[in-house]
Swiss-Prot record:
SUPFAM superfamilies: AbrB/MazE/MraZ-like (SSF89447)
Keywords from the UniProt entry: Cytoplasm, DNA-binding, Repeat, Repressor, Transcription, Transcription regulation
Pfam entry (one): MraZ
GO cellular component: cytoplasm; nucleoid
Job description of the protein: Negatively regulates its own expression and that of the subsequent genes in the proximal part of the division and cell wall (dcw) gene cluster. Acts by binding directly to DNA. May also regulate the expression of genes outside the dcw cluster.
Compartment annotation: Cytoplasm, Nucleoid
Gene Ontology BP annotations: negative regulation of DNA-templated transcription initiation
Full protein name: Transcriptional regulator MraZ
PANTHER family in UniProt: TRANSCRIPTIONAL REGULATOR MRAZ (PTHR34701:SF1)
Boundaries of every SpoVT-AbrB domain copy: 5-52, 81-124
Keyword Hydrolase assigned: no
Gene source species: Escherichia coli O127:H6 (strain E2348/69 / EPEC)
Length: 152
């Protein structure tokens, strides 16, 4: 399980260094093999260990290629999916087209989200967090049943 937000830097070749606390788990569970794709709702990337991505692919394969909405989701997620292998120094090379989609340049937020990571431009991440907090403060109590059961 991945959790927390960590600031990492992209080097001049577009590689990011995976924080040490995740490396062993990624090597053990995925042999360092990852898949990166775009998030279709936010200006960030989704980074999955290969076994987790394969579950997503199975779900995508069950969508209808004749339904325009389902086909669009398949096209966006699969069409942008890029395999990346963690190197011996614990770095992942993020494809240029993916970096461009998320506006990633130097400072990147690696955000744990249970079975995957989100990759955000640092400034965009902080703006999104502020927007999310503001939206929660303005919320009128329209919580889903699952959120109503969440006690913090």
């Amino acid at each position: 399980m991945f959790r927390g937000a960590t600031l990492v830097n992209l080097d001049s070749k577009g590689r990011l260094s995976v924080p040490t606390r995740y490396r062993e788990q990624l090597l053990e569970n995925a042999a360092g093999q990852m898949v990166c794709t775009i998030d279709i709702h936010h200006p960030c990337l989704l980074l999955y260990p290969l076994p987790e991505w394969e579950i997503i692919e199975q779900k995508l394969s069950r969508l209808s290629s004749t339904n325009p909405v389902e086909r669009r989701v398949q096209r966006l997620l699969l069409g942008h999916a890029s395999e990346c292998q963690m190197d011996g120094a614990g770095r992942l090379l993020i494809a240029p087209v993916l970096r461009q989609h998320a506006g990633l340049t130097k400072e990147v937020m690696l955000v744990g989200q249970f079975n995957k990571f989100e990759l955000w431009d640092e400034t965009t991440w902080h703006q999104q967090v502020k927007e999310d907090i503001d939206a929660e403060q303005l919320a009128t109590g329209d919580l889903s049943e699952r959120l109503q059961d969440l006690s913090l």
